[in-house]
């Protein structure tokens, strides 16, 4: 086997840009910066917002009803 072909695997600190949380892991990179981590991600914190699409569906159905009504009048 070839000697010294693998990169250095060292301890690095991962920094979250959103909440400032930092934790240590191992990697071949020198620094790791993440946009969102498990401390500030909505799924993990329980602050997940549900998107209400009922208004959008109703608006689409209303538009679609108008277009089908105008097509029926044209025939």
From Swiss-Prot:
| Signal peptide region | none
Give GO cellular component annotations, separated by semicolons. ribonucleoprotein complex; ribosome
Q: Name one GO molecular function term.
A: rRNA binding
Q: Which UniProt keywords apply?
A: Ribonucleoprotein, Ribosomal protein, RNA-binding, rRNA-binding
Q: Which GO terms describe its biological process?
A: translation
Pfam families linked to this entry: Ribosomal_L31 (PF01197)
Gene3D superfamilies recorded: Ribosomal protein L31
| HAMAP family registered for this protein in UniProt | Ribosomal_bL31_1
Query: Of which family is this protein a member?
Result: Belongs to the bacterial ribosomal protein bL31 family. Type A subfamily.
Q: What does this protein do?
A: Binds the 23S rRNA.
What subunit structure does UniProt give?
Answer: Part of the 50S ribosomal subunit.
Q: What is this protein called?
A: Large ribosomal subunit protein bL31
Q: Which organism is it from?
A: Chlorobium limicola (strain DSM 245 / NBRC 103803 / 6330)
Designated gene of the protein: rpmE
